[in-house]
Amino acid sequence: CYMLAGLMLSASSCSSWLSEDDAPVMSYDYYETEAGVNAAITAAYGFLRWGVGGERFDVLTELGTDLFTEGEDGSNRESYNKYATQLNPDDGILYEMWENHYKGISDANIAMQKIRDSQDLLESVKIQSYAEMQFIRAYLYFDLVQQFGRIPLVTEGSFEIRTDFKRAPIADVYNVIISDLRNAAENLPEKASVLGRATRYSAAHLLAKVYLTRGSAVKDARGQKATDMDSTLYYAEQVINSGAYALQENFSSLWDIKNQGNSEAVFAVQFTTEPMFNGDGNKQHLYWLSWYEDQPGMLRDIENGRPYRRHVATKKTMDDLFDRLHDSRFYKSFKWVYYANNVSTLPVWESLSYDGNVYFTPDPSKGQIEGELKFQHGDTAIYYTMQETGLASNSDEMRKLRADYTYSYFPREMHSIRYFPSLVKYLDPSRPSVSEEKGSREWVRMRLGETYLLAAEAAGRKGDFDKAAEYINVIRKRAAWAEGEQKDQQIWLFEGGVNDTKSTYDALKV
């Protein structure tokens, strides 16, 4: 009913002088036509945008984990990062997710019913359109069952208000998801006619993930079967062996805003630069950024982003998760350098004191001339590093060390919930203005890199460790610094490496 309401709303926005006799009448029969089916599919995809249209999926999936923790600002820190008493069933994020996803499921159910009943659609159109709606319904149910467990399972369209929904067993929900996706994987096209539409490989990837999730249960009764790992591997390999996708050669390319829709994206939720059609937009560019505009030589701009400081990488992520010497993904995932963009706040060399004690005096032998600019517009203004100085962050020794640099220097001890290396994954410099929150960057939900990992885990659980290692090494080869590639200078300055262009793959492969 939500699709019809939306179309009726747009139709009712015409000027009041229109004759009622000429007013358009919209009925559900419209969805039995090809134009109506296309409109229904487009509307249904809109529900997939919800997760990044605000502080939503990032809060549900990252806060309170061992990978990211709370930043300096935000209202979800107590409830989702600390699991304090503020986390209640009536929380706004949970309510919004429930409402959005069940609206999408309702639309999909109605559309599927109308597609089945249509006498006007070509059989080929009916089969493909029905499969596409099944993909969307399964996608939404998979989100819900992972978040809430037992949930109402609605598979038929409802044209009347209902309040008698009962929660179904988790196993039943998984059975519907798998049934929907198996049909979608069989009947969707190999290549989408429009960017952002699902393909049989989108369905196969999601199906592999669903089987792996179901089969990984230890105590939960998800309906898991002994064949779940076989099914995971089967569908993951359909994607891998299709030839339809390829890993990006350089990990950095994944985050290049000019490289959207690249060969590695198996399914990505789309947005647009047209405000009228962008809904809430993709707002993830706001939440992973460090404060920078208070530093000398800097002002807030589009390229560096609008820093809401919601999420900061944990100590585990920064210090323990990566083999930083050999794995290029670490240094390619964060922003380490900012370049001066504000001539009015360029700093000069000067004597500095704290609490009455002079801790720094410019040294002319180092080119530090009292009153002269420390750097120019376009030069490095901020530099974050992983250097461990051994100095306390609030000591005169640390203040002296930092003052000796031309730029604002942040060694490891100076990283905080306000100042930290920003995650570059969601940056969106395509926004029309600095203050614009609604970004247009695509939200990649499925990547070939993940497909390889799904296959590797399934193979490992089946005891085929050679195959698991083979798939893992495909990912690790891309993760390594490539032969001929210039490494980040921190590799030899602070990580104990050397300044060379040799591949580090041998150190990473299993």
Task: Cite the ranges covered by each PLM segment.
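Short coil/turn linking the two alpha-helices of tandem helical-hairpin repeats
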Residues: 143-146, 150-152, 192, 213-222, ...
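C-terminal substrate/ligand-recognition segments
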Residues: 91, 340-478
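Conserved, well-structured interaction surfaces
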Residues: 32-52, 73-148, 162-175, 180-195, ...
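C-terminal motif of bacterial Sec signal peptides marking the signal peptidase cleavage site
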Residues: 10-13
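An aromatic- and glycine-enriched ligand-binding surface/loop that stacks and positions planar moieties
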Residues: 15-76, 209-392
